[in-house]
Amino acid sequence: MLDKVLKIATRQSPLALWQAQYVKARLEQAHPGLNVELVPMVTRGDVILDTPLAKVGGKGLFVKELELAMLEGRADIAVHSMKDVPVEFPEGLGLVTICERDDPRDAFVSNHYASIDELPAGSVVGTSSLRRQCQLAATRPDLVIRSLRGNVGTRLSKLDNGEYDAIILAAAGLKRLKLEARIRQPLSPEQSLPAVGQGAVGIECRLDDAWTQALLAPLNHAETAVRVRAERAMNTRLEGGCQVPIGSYAELVNGELWLRALVGAPDGSQMVRGERRGPAEQAEALGISLAEELLDNGARDILAAVYDGEAPR
Protein backbone atom coordinates (compact mmCIF):
# COMPACT_ATOMS: atom_id res chain seq x y z
CA MET A 1 0.00 0.00 0.00
CA LEU A 2 2.96 2.34 -0.46
CA ASP A 3 1.13 4.02 -3.34
CA LYS A 4 -1.21 5.55 -0.74
CA VAL A 5 -0.28 9.06 0.46
CA LEU A 6 0.18 9.50 4.21
CA LYS A 7 -1.04 12.98 5.17
CA ILE A 8 0.37 14.86 8.17
CA ALA A 9 -1.75 17.60 9.77
CA THR A 10 0.48 20.36 11.13
CA ARG A 11 0.38 23.91 12.37
CA GLN A 12 2.13 26.47 10.19
CA SER A 13 4.64 27.94 12.63
CA PRO A 14 8.30 27.30 11.72
CA LEU A 15 8.69 25.00 14.73
CA ALA A 16 5.56 22.97 13.94
CA LEU A 17 6.67 22.62 10.33
CA TRP A 18 10.12 21.48 11.51
CA GLN A 19 8.46 18.77 13.62
CA ALA A 20 6.25 17.63 10.73
CA GLN A 21 9.21 17.59 8.32
CA TYR A 22 11.20 15.60 10.88
CA VAL A 23 8.47 12.94 11.09
CA LYS A 24 8.09 12.94 7.29
CA ALA A 25 11.84 12.31 6.86
CA ARG A 26 11.84 9.56 9.51
CA LEU A 27 8.87 7.83 7.84
CA GLU A 28 10.44 8.03 4.38
CA GLN A 29 13.70 6.67 5.78
CA ALA A 30 11.92 3.76 7.49
CA HIS A 31 9.68 3.02 4.49
CA PRO A 32 11.43 3.76 1.16
CA GLY A 33 8.89 4.66 -1.52
CA LEU A 34 6.27 5.90 0.95
CA ASN A 35 4.54 9.11 -0.14
CA VAL A 36 4.17 11.60 2.73
CA GLU A 37 2.44 14.96 2.40
CA LEU A 38 2.07 17.87 4.84
CA VAL A 39 -1.35 19.44 5.40
CA PRO A 40 -0.66 22.83 7.07
CA MET A 41 -3.48 24.32 9.19
CA VAL A 42 -4.26 27.28 11.43
CA THR A 43 -5.37 26.52 15.01
CA ARG A 44 -7.21 28.68 17.52
CA GLY A 45 -4.00 29.09 19.49
CA ASP A 46 -2.30 30.55 16.41
CA VAL A 47 -5.07 33.13 15.94
CA ILE A 48 -5.56 34.43 19.49
CA LEU A 49 -2.25 36.18 20.08
CA ASP A 50 -3.25 39.17 22.20
CA THR A 51 -4.35 37.23 25.29
CA PRO A 52 -2.27 35.17 27.76
CA LEU A 53 -2.68 31.47 27.00
CA ALA A 54 -3.99 30.67 30.47
CA LYS A 55 -6.99 32.97 29.85
CA VAL A 56 -8.11 31.50 26.52
CA GLY A 57 -8.60 27.92 27.66
CA GLY A 58 -5.27 26.14 27.41
CA LYS A 59 -6.50 22.59 26.83
CA GLY A 60 -6.10 21.59 23.19
CA LEU A 61 -5.71 25.14 21.96
CA PHE A 62 -3.14 24.09 19.37
CA VAL A 63 -4.47 20.65 18.43
CA LYS A 64 -8.28 20.67 17.98
CA GLU A 65 -8.27 21.65 14.30
CA LEU A 66 -5.66 18.97 13.57
CA GLU A 67 -7.78 16.35 15.34
CA LEU A 68 -10.86 17.33 13.35
CA ALA A 69 -8.89 16.85 10.12
CA MET A 70 -8.00 13.29 11.16
CA LEU A 71 -11.55 12.44 12.19
CA GLU A 72 -12.84 13.74 8.85
CA GLY A 73 -10.19 11.82 6.89
CA ARG A 74 -8.39 14.92 5.57
CA ALA A 75 -5.23 13.83 7.41
CA ASP A 76 -3.88 10.53 8.74
CA ILE A 77 -1.65 11.73 11.56
CA ALA A 78 -0.93 14.90 13.53
CA VAL A 79 2.49 15.80 14.86
CA HIS A 80 2.60 17.63 18.18
CA SER A 81 5.05 19.09 20.62
CA MET A 82 4.23 16.79 23.56
CA LYS A 83 3.92 19.69 25.99
CA ASP A 84 0.93 20.97 23.94
CA VAL A 85 -0.95 17.64 23.91
CA PRO A 86 -4.05 17.55 26.18
CA VAL A 87 -4.50 14.71 28.64
CA GLU A 88 -7.70 13.55 26.91
CA PHE A 89 -8.29 12.70 23.26
CA PRO A 90 -11.46 12.80 21.17
CA GLU A 91 -13.12 9.42 20.76
CA GLY A 92 -11.36 7.44 18.03
CA LEU A 93 -8.01 9.23 18.32
CA GLY A 94 -4.96 8.50 20.44
CA LEU A 95 -1.28 9.11 20.94
CA VAL A 96 0.42 6.13 19.31
CA THR A 97 4.06 7.18 18.95
CA ILE A 98 6.49 9.29 20.95
CA CYS A 99 9.78 10.09 19.24
CA GLU A 100 13.13 10.35 21.01
CA ARG A 101 13.28 13.30 23.36
CA ASP A 102 15.46 16.30 22.57
CA ASP A 103 16.73 18.75 25.18
CA PRO A 104 13.90 19.03 27.77
CA ARG A 105 15.22 22.17 29.45
CA ASP A 106 14.04 25.76 29.48
CA ALA A 107 16.47 28.35 28.14
CA PHE A 108 17.27 31.85 29.37
CA VAL A 109 17.64 34.23 26.41
CA SER A 110 18.89 37.80 26.75
CA ASN A 111 20.96 40.28 24.78
CA HIS A 112 22.49 41.94 27.84
CA TYR A 113 22.64 39.40 30.67
CA ALA A 114 24.33 36.00 30.80
CA SER A 115 22.09 34.44 33.44
CA ILE A 116 18.99 34.93 35.57
CA ASP A 117 21.26 35.81 38.51
CA GLU A 118 22.71 38.75 36.54
CA LEU A 119 19.31 40.39 35.95
CA PRO A 120 18.95 43.60 37.98
CA ALA A 121 15.87 44.05 40.17
CA GLY A 122 12.91 45.29 38.15
CA SER A 123 14.06 43.62 34.91
CA VAL A 124 11.21 42.61 32.60
CA VAL A 125 11.14 38.90 31.69
CA GLY A 126 8.75 37.47 29.09
CA THR A 127 7.12 34.04 29.13
CA SER A 128 3.78 32.58 28.04
CA SER A 129 3.94 29.84 30.65
CA LEU A 130 2.51 29.90 34.18
CA ARG A 131 4.90 27.04 35.00
CA ARG A 132 7.96 29.13 34.08
CA GLN A 133 6.43 32.20 35.69
CA CYS A 134 5.82 30.57 39.07
CA GLN A 135 9.33 29.11 39.29
CA LEU A 136 10.98 32.37 38.23
CA ALA A 137 8.86 34.42 40.63
CA ALA A 138 9.73 32.06 43.49
CA THR A 139 13.49 32.50 43.01
CA ARG A 140 13.45 36.14 41.83
CA PRO A 141 10.39 37.94 43.23
CA ASP A 142 12.08 41.25 42.34
CA LEU A 143 11.63 40.67 38.58
CA VAL A 144 8.68 41.87 36.49
CA ILE A 145 7.20 38.94 34.55
CA ARG A 146 5.09 39.79 31.50
CA SER A 147 3.11 37.63 29.09
CA LEU A 148 4.85 36.81 25.81
CA ARG A 149 2.94 35.22 22.91
CA GLY A 150 3.72 34.32 19.30
CA ASN A 151 6.04 31.87 17.59
CA VAL A 152 9.74 31.68 18.44
CA GLY A 153 10.76 34.29 15.85
CA THR A 154 8.12 36.74 17.08
CA ARG A 155 9.22 36.31 20.68
CA LEU A 156 12.88 36.89 19.81
CA SER A 157 11.92 40.01 17.83
CA LYS A 158 10.10 41.41 20.87
CA LEU A 159 13.23 40.81 22.95
CA ASP A 160 15.44 42.43 20.29
CA ASN A 161 13.09 45.43 20.11
CA GLY A 162 13.68 46.09 23.78
CA GLU A 163 10.23 45.10 25.07
CA TYR A 164 11.87 42.62 27.48
CA ASP A 165 15.23 42.36 29.22
CA ALA A 166 15.11 38.57 28.89
CA ILE A 167 12.75 35.80 27.82
CA ILE A 168 12.41 32.12 28.69
CA LEU A 169 11.90 29.63 25.83
CA ALA A 170 12.17 25.87 25.35
CA ALA A 171 15.75 24.91 24.52
CA ALA A 172 14.60 22.20 22.08
CA GLY A 173 12.65 24.69 19.97
CA LEU A 174 15.62 27.02 19.64
CA LYS A 175 17.92 24.15 18.71
CA ARG A 176 15.50 22.76 16.11
CA LEU A 177 15.35 26.17 14.43
CA LYS A 178 19.17 26.45 14.55
CA LEU A 179 18.93 29.32 17.03
CA GLU A 180 20.89 27.70 19.86
CA ALA A 181 23.37 30.62 19.74
CA ARG A 182 20.61 32.73 21.34
CA ILE A 183 20.68 30.57 24.50
CA ARG A 184 22.62 32.40 27.21
CA GLN A 185 21.89 29.89 29.96
CA PRO A 186 20.20 26.47 29.76
CA LEU A 187 18.13 26.10 32.93
CA SER A 188 18.60 22.81 34.76
CA PRO A 189 15.51 20.95 36.03
CA GLU A 190 16.51 22.18 39.50
CA GLN A 191 16.25 25.80 38.28
CA SER A 192 13.17 25.36 36.10
CA LEU A 193 11.39 22.01 36.12
CA PRO A 194 10.24 21.32 32.52
CA ALA A 195 6.69 20.94 31.28
CA VAL A 196 5.12 17.51 30.87
CA GLY A 197 6.63 15.95 27.73
CA GLN A 198 8.84 18.97 26.98
CA GLY A 199 11.38 18.29 24.22
CA ALA A 200 9.51 15.26 22.83
CA VAL A 201 7.49 15.01 19.61
CA GLY A 202 4.30 12.94 19.70
CA ILE A 203 2.23 11.50 16.88
CA GLU A 204 -1.55 11.15 17.10
CA CYS A 205 -3.70 9.11 14.73
CA ARG A 206 -6.99 7.25 14.39
CA LEU A 207 -7.07 4.22 16.66
CA ASP A 208 -8.76 2.07 14.00
CA ASP A 209 -6.06 2.85 11.40
CA ALA A 210 -3.80 -0.20 11.66
CA TRP A 211 -1.94 0.66 8.41
CA THR A 212 -0.77 4.02 9.72
CA GLN A 213 0.07 2.67 13.17
CA ALA A 214 2.29 0.00 11.60
CA LEU A 215 4.13 2.68 9.63
CA LEU A 216 4.66 4.75 12.79
CA ALA A 217 5.96 1.88 14.94
CA PRO A 218 9.68 2.30 14.04
CA LEU A 219 9.58 5.94 15.15
CA ASN A 220 8.56 5.15 18.73
CA HIS A 221 11.34 5.58 21.30
CA ALA A 222 10.65 3.26 24.22
CA GLU A 223 12.71 5.10 26.84
CA THR A 224 11.17 8.48 26.00
CA ALA A 225 7.70 6.95 25.90
CA VAL A 226 7.95 5.50 29.41
CA ARG A 227 9.28 8.79 30.82
CA VAL A 228 6.51 10.81 29.18
CA ARG A 229 3.89 8.24 30.30
CA ALA A 230 4.85 8.86 33.93
CA GLU A 231 4.72 12.65 33.46
CA ARG A 232 1.37 12.53 31.68
CA ALA A 233 -0.19 10.17 34.23
CA MET A 234 0.67 12.67 36.94
CA ASN A 235 -0.73 15.54 34.87
CA THR A 236 -3.93 13.61 34.11
CA ARG A 237 -4.57 12.99 37.81
CA LEU A 238 -4.02 16.70 38.49
CA GLU A 239 -6.39 17.48 35.58
CA GLY A 240 -3.73 19.77 34.19
CA GLY A 241 -4.02 21.45 30.81
CA CYS A 242 -0.99 22.73 28.94
CA GLN A 243 -1.50 26.13 30.61
CA VAL A 244 -1.35 25.45 34.32
CA PRO A 245 1.56 25.95 36.74
CA ILE A 246 2.59 22.29 36.70
CA GLY A 247 6.09 20.98 36.05
CA SER A 248 6.98 17.32 35.69
CA TYR A 249 10.15 15.58 34.58
CA ALA A 250 11.01 11.87 34.57
CA GLU A 251 14.45 10.38 34.04
CA LEU A 252 15.47 6.74 33.65
CA VAL A 253 18.46 5.92 35.83
CA ASN A 254 19.72 2.33 35.52
CA GLY A 255 16.25 1.14 34.57
CA GLU A 256 14.59 2.97 37.46
CA LEU A 257 12.27 5.92 36.91
CA TRP A 258 12.92 9.11 38.82
CA LEU A 259 9.91 11.42 38.57
CA ARG A 260 9.94 14.98 39.89
CA ALA A 261 6.96 17.33 39.90
CA LEU A 262 5.75 20.67 41.16
CA VAL A 263 2.59 22.74 41.31
CA GLY A 264 3.04 26.44 42.01
CA ALA A 265 0.97 29.56 42.52
CA PRO A 266 1.57 31.79 39.46
CA ASP A 267 3.02 34.55 41.66
CA GLY A 268 5.56 32.14 43.16
CA SER A 269 4.16 32.53 46.68
CA GLN A 270 3.44 28.80 47.06
CA MET A 271 5.25 25.82 45.61
CA VAL A 272 4.40 22.17 46.23
CA ARG A 273 7.10 19.74 45.13
CA GLY A 274 7.50 15.99 45.25
CA GLU A 275 9.34 13.08 43.70
CA ARG A 276 9.05 9.33 43.26
CA ARG A 277 11.39 6.52 42.26
CA GLY A 278 10.31 3.12 41.05
CA PRO A 279 10.41 0.52 38.28
CA ALA A 280 9.78 1.73 34.72
CA GLU A 281 6.93 -0.78 34.34
CA GLN A 282 5.00 1.19 36.97
CA ALA A 283 5.30 4.54 35.14
CA GLU A 284 1.59 5.41 35.32
CA ALA A 285 1.20 4.27 38.92
CA LEU A 286 4.20 6.39 39.96
CA GLY A 287 2.72 9.43 38.23
CA ILE A 288 -0.70 8.99 39.86
CA SER A 289 0.81 8.36 43.29
CA LEU A 290 2.95 11.51 43.06
CA ALA A 291 -0.05 13.56 41.92
CA GLU A 292 -2.06 12.35 44.95
CA GLU A 293 0.77 13.43 47.24
CA LEU A 294 0.93 16.88 45.63
CA LEU A 295 -2.85 17.32 45.90
CA ASP A 296 -2.77 16.38 49.59
CA ASN A 297 0.12 18.78 50.22
CA GLY A 298 -1.61 21.89 48.88
CA ALA A 299 -1.71 21.54 45.10
CA ARG A 300 -5.49 21.11 45.18
CA ASP A 301 -5.94 24.64 46.57
CA ILE A 302 -3.40 26.18 44.20
CA LEU A 303 -5.05 24.62 41.14
CA ALA A 304 -8.54 25.54 42.36
CA ALA A 305 -7.48 29.18 42.47
CA VAL A 306 -5.95 28.96 38.98
CA TYR A 307 -9.15 27.36 37.64
CA ASP A 308 -11.19 30.24 39.13
CA GLY A 309 -12.69 28.24 41.91
CA GLU A 310 -13.24 24.99 40.03
CA ALA A 311 -11.32 22.57 42.21
CA PRO A 312 -9.88 19.42 40.64
CA ARG A 313 -11.95 16.41 41.60
Curated annotation (Swiss-Prot):
Entry EC number(s): 2.5.1.61
Pathway: Porphyrin-containing compound metabolism; protoporphyrin-IX biosynthesis; coproporphyrinogen-III from 5-aminolevulinate: step 2/4
Class of this enzyme: transferase
Cofactor note: Binds 1 dipyrromethane group covalently.
Catalysed conversion reaction: 4 porphobilinogen + H2O = hydroxymethylbilane + 4 NH4(+)
Gene Ontology cellular-component terms listed: cytoplasm
S-(dipyrrolylmethanemethyl)cysteine found at: C242
Subunit: Monomer.
Protein name as catalogued: Porphobilinogen deaminase
Organism annotation: Klebsiella pneumoniae (strain 342)
